[in-house]
């Protein structure tokens, strides 16, 4: 597991990175995480999130555009534990999560807007690996995202921590 400091990455790569608007909170057991972007666009339906965390995710971060909904949780403890077991670096969720006490103990990075106790409907509706835009930034599959307690940044290519 790599440790990333977004302020240092911003200082080292000012022309490469885009800074996501500061609206996310860190809920995961990892203080920092980063990797190649895999995207999901969905609204109050986490069917695609469930499908993706079942797959191997080494070196990848699942970026979920949940439309900013504050009415349903797109991630809970069971899916977070599956994501960690399958090697995902983390998730950035433009929406809510639940089971926050368990997720805080899970070896997974999780950034989200808030917590909400209600689960989603499972209708199988959503899009996988499409460009998604929220918080002032467009997230494209195959680009890179890095997150820590300071914020979330996006880069078109992988970044190395400065020496």
Swiss-Prot record:
Catalytic activity: 4-hydroxy-4-methyl-2-oxoglutarate = 2 pyruvate; oxaloacetate + H(+) = pyruvate + CO2
Gene Ontology BP annotations: regulation of RNA metabolic process
Binding-site residues, a divalent metal cation: 99
EC number(s) on file: 4.1.3.17, 4.1.1.112
SUPFAM superfamilies: RraA-like
Cofactor binding remark: Divalent metal cation.
Coiled coil: none
GO molecular function: 4-hydroxy-4-methyl-2-oxoglutarate aldolase activity; metal ion binding; oxaloacetate decarboxylase activity; ribonuclease inhibitor activity
Residue numbers binding substrate: 76-79, 98
PANTHER family: 4-HYDROXY-4-METHYL-2-OXOGLUTARATE ALDOLASE 3-RELATED, REGULATOR OF RIBONUCLEASE ACTIVITY A
Function: Catalyzes the aldol cleavage of 4-hydroxy-4-methyl-2-oxoglutarate (HMG) into 2 molecules of pyruvate. Also contains a secondary oxaloacetate (OAA) decarboxylase activity due to the common pyruvate enolate transition state formed following C-C bond cleavage in the retro-aldol and decarboxylation reactions.
Oligomer and partners: Homotrimer.
Stated family: Belongs to the class II aldolase/RraA-like family.
Protein name according to UniProt: Putative 4-hydroxy-4-methyl-2-oxoglutarate aldolase
Organism, scientific name: Pseudomonas fluorescens (strain ATCC BAA-477 / NRRL B-23932 / Pf-5)
């Amino acid at each position: 597991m790599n440790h990333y400091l977004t302020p240092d990455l911003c200082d080292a790569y000012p022309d490469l990175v885009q800074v996501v608007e500061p609206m996310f909170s860190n809920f995961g057991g990892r203080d920092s995480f980063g990797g190649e972007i895999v995207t999901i666009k969905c609204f109050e339906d986490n069917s695609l999130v469930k499908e993706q965390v079942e797959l191997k995710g080494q070196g990848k971060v699942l970026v979920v555009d949940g439309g900013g909904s504050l009415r349903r949780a797109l991630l809970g403890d069971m899916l977070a534990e599956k994501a960690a077991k399958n090697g995902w670096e983390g998730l950035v969720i433009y929406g809510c999560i639940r089971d926050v006490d368990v997720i805080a103990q899970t070896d997974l990075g999780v950034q989200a807007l808030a917590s909400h106790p209600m689960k989603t409907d499972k209708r199988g509706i959503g899009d996988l690996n499409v460009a998604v835009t929220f918080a002032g930034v467009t997230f494209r599959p195959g680009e890179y995202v890095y997150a820590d307690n300071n914020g979330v940044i996006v880069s078109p290519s992988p970044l190395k921590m400065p020496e």
